[in-house]
Amino acid sequence: MRVILLGAPGAGKGTQAQFITEEFGIPQISTGDMLRAAVKAGSEMGLKAKAVMDAGQLVSDDIIIGLVKERLTQDDCANGALFDGFPRTIPQADALKDAGVEIDYVVEIDVADEEIVKRMSGRRVHEASGRTYHLVYNPPKVEGKDDVTGEDLVQRADDTEETVRLRLGVYHDQTAPLIGYYQDWLKADSATAPKFVKVNGIGDLNEIKQSLLASLKA
């Protein structure tokens, strides 16, 4: 089973990705990890990518697609793979399609922007230990203080409302159009298009997992 996972930053893709990979025994493939591994291994596509990166340029979609095809031939992908953060744009999705890389499911984890802002901007962290709290869902016993040490909690720069909204803006501009892309492909050609699954990412974690599992096994 080959799955593309879509959803805004903070929608809970990481949690669901881990669940899917464990449930179906497939690896999670991110383009960053794939690039690093190919460069380290000195594969043909890895050497091409290294030459581009060494020149300070962006790795082209053609090279990324080549790396994807190369990665899918490895033993751990025999049962499929989960694509994390790829494709990110319509041109990448087109390139994947044109290269004949078959995808079984596209899964969208659907969470409204305001819920994501609430989730992420409410996070507070004890930097020394990495303990994480949330002002609404998991507040510390004493406001602004770590439960164990009593030291101050901080809000990471990535979690400020301004930063979260900026990241959501990038997602809506670049990646959200993929949802329409795959839905339109399915309407036009259901024989070759991946099945599209939309999962509500708000609510009890186990219920979300069961809903996702039922859709992928349907």
Swiss-Prot record:
The keyword Magnesium does not apply. The keyword GTP-binding does not apply. Its EC number is 2.7.4.3. Keywords: ATP-binding, Cytoplasm, Kinase, Nucleotide biosynthesis, Nucleotide-binding, Transferase. Signal peptide: none annotated. GO terms for molecular function: adenylate kinase activity; ATP binding. InterPro entries: Adenyl_kin_sub, Adenylat/UMP-CMP_kin, Adenylat_kinase_CS, Adenylate_kinase_lid-dom, P-loop_NTPase. ATP binds at G10, A11, G12, K13, G14, T15, R123, T132, Y133, G203. It is found in: Cytoplasm. Residues 30-59 are annotated as: NMP. It catalyses: AMP + ATP = 2 ADP. One of its GO terms (cellular component) is cytoplasm. Its main location: cytoplasm. GO terms for biological process: AMP salvage. Gene3D superfamilies: P-loop containing nucleotide triphosphate hydrolases. Monomer. This is Adenylate kinase. The gene is adk.
